C-alpha cells in the first residue's frame, strides 16, 4: 500500500467545517482533520494586504510545511499541484530526505503566465522551473498545448505526461441545481437570457469585450452576471456605472454549495480569455460548467488550450476573432439568434463528454496508474 503526501494551500470553505472539522494538532502551527478516512494536516495562513507581510506569510507556510513533512512516516509519493513553483522545489528536497518519489502537476506555466518576460527575477524563475521539471520523478500537465510548450524544457521528456483535470459529478451535474434556494435580490426570476461568469475577476480574463457586448445589447432582453472578487472588480464596477449598464450585475462570491443552483440559473456561461495570458492557463471551471449541462460562450485565440479542448465537443460557441469590433458583433448576433433548444443541445453534449472522459473516477484512475508505474 502506497502512502501519498499532497502538498498545497487552500482557502477555508466555512460550510465544509461542519463535515470536516479542524482541530489543532500543534497549537498555533497546524491543524488536523479527516477527509473520507484520510488524515489531513493544515497550515493556517492569514491573508495580508501589506505586500511584505504577504511575502513573509508565504515563506512561513513553506518552512512549516517542510518541517511537518519531515516528521511524516512511510511516504512513497509526494504530489505537488502548482502554482507556485516553490512547492515543487521544497518537495523535491523533502523527497530526497524521505527517499520517496515526487509528481509535479502543472496547472499554469510559470513564469510564462507573468506579464514581465525578462529581468533577473524572471531568469531565476526559469531556472527554478527547469529544476522542478528535471528533478521530479514525474510531471503531469493538463492538455496537449501545455505539453508542447514545456516539453523542450525537459532533459528526459518521458517523465512528462498528460492527465486532465476532473469534475466531481456527485456535486456538479445537470440535475443538481435548485434555483429556488437562491437569493432573489441577486438572482431575480426574469425571462431574459442570462449570461454568467463566476470566479476570479482578474487579469487572466479580458473584460473589455464583455463591457462592449453589454453596451451593444443594452435594451435587449439579455443580462450579464459576474460573481467573484479580484483586482479588476473595481474597474468593472466603475465602467458599469459610467456607461449605465443596468444589464450587468456584479455580485460577491457565493457559497460553493450554491454553485450548482447558480449554474442552473444561467442560460450561458461565458469565459473571455486575456490574449496576453491565454496560452498559459486553462480555466478548470470549464469542466464544472459542462457537467452541469450549461453551454459556454468563449473568446480566445486559435490553438489556445481552451479552444483546442472545446472545439471537439460541440458544447460551446467559440469566438476566435481578434478584432474587438468583429468579435463583439459576432457574439451579439449569436445571442440574438440562438434558440433555447440549441442551447440545450450544447449543454447535453458537454454532460456526455464529462461522463465519458473527465469524471472524478476516470481521472483519478490515471493518477493511480501513474503512481503504480513509478
Predicted regions and their residues:
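A short, well-ordered alpha-helix in the C-terminal region of glycosyltransferases
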Residues: 341-357
